[in-house]
A protein has these predicted regions:
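ABC ATP-binding cassette signature C-motif
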Residues: 1, 57-247
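Coupling and communication elements adjacent to P-loop NTPase active sites across diverse families
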Residues: 2-85, 89-92, 223
Length: 247
């Protein structure tokens, strides 16, 4: 029994190390896991104190065949052509990762698709059965107010019951008095967890995520990865996390 626990712990640590050691923002956590692996002894196995959020995106409506049609989108910013005659179509079972070095192009495309920016030319059309939830790369404006976490999330929920709303916050490890904290004083990681709560409570069947793993710890990244894999709708996302892109 003890040996089995040891083997499970070693495997868990090895998975964390292999996944995150190459990621600069998480390399410290990976190094500490490495030390734990080196020190591990048979009698040192204790229950893990790490907590994983529970990320589960459940669409309120099944998506139809026609999801998104993009025709000739073009956008120039400060004299630089960011999008040039972009054309593509998405169908009901597509999960699309936007990769590459031009982060501004990805963010610009997402902003246009979410109605936050106008293209210079071209058009796009969402399918009639679609509803979208958006995770922006820069969420500063979302939290520039005096609302508490509970009140902030309630404004995005069709059901205004506080217990219902707190349930979504609880999934993202906001407990008890956390709900009365003002959103404008939250850390980067807490804001990301709020945004993911907002996406879950929306019941959208299309998720658009622009670098969602920024500011997240390894446990939260793992939970997000699992939530994205289980999501039955359409995904459009940009991420530097190779594991999320591959899976």
């Amino acid at each position: 029994e003890a040996n089995k626990k040891k083997e499970e712990k070693i495997k868990e640590l090895q998975e964390f190390i292999s996944r995150f050691s190459a990621n600069a923002s998480n390399s410290k956590q990976a190094t500490s896991r490495k030390r734990a692996l080196e020190k591990i002894q048979l009698d040192e196995i204790r229950p893990s104190s790490r907590k994983y959020p529970y990320i589960d995106f459940r669409p309120n409506r099944e998506i139809g065949n026609e999801v998104l049609s993009v025709e000739g989108l073009t956008k120039t910013i400060d004299g630089v052509k960011i999008l040039d005659n972009l054309t593509f179509t998405l169908n009901h079972d597509d999960k699309v990762a936007f990769v590459g070095g031009n982060e501004l192009a990805k963010t610009t495309l997402f902003k246009i698709l979410m109605g936050e920016m106008e293209p210079d030319s071209g058009s796009f059309k969402w399918g009639i059965t679609t509803s979208q939830a958006y995770f922006p790369k820069d969420s500063t404006e979302e939290f520039n107010n005096d609302l508490t976490i509970v009140d902030w999330l309630t404004q995005f929920s069709e059901i205004k019951d506080m217990t219902y709303v707190r349930g979504f916050l609880g999934r993202m490890l906001f407990a008890g008095d956390d709900g009365v904290k003002k959103v404008k004083v939250l850390s980067g990681g807490e804001k990301v967890r709020c945004l993911l709560s907002k996406m879950m409570i929306s019941g959208a069947n299309v998720l658009v995520l622009d670098e969602p793993t920024n500011h997240l710890d390894m446990e939260s990244i793992t939970a997000l990865n699992n939530g994205m894999m289980k999501f039955p709708g359409v995904l459009l996302f940009a991420s530097h996390d190779h594991q999320i892109v591959q899976t």
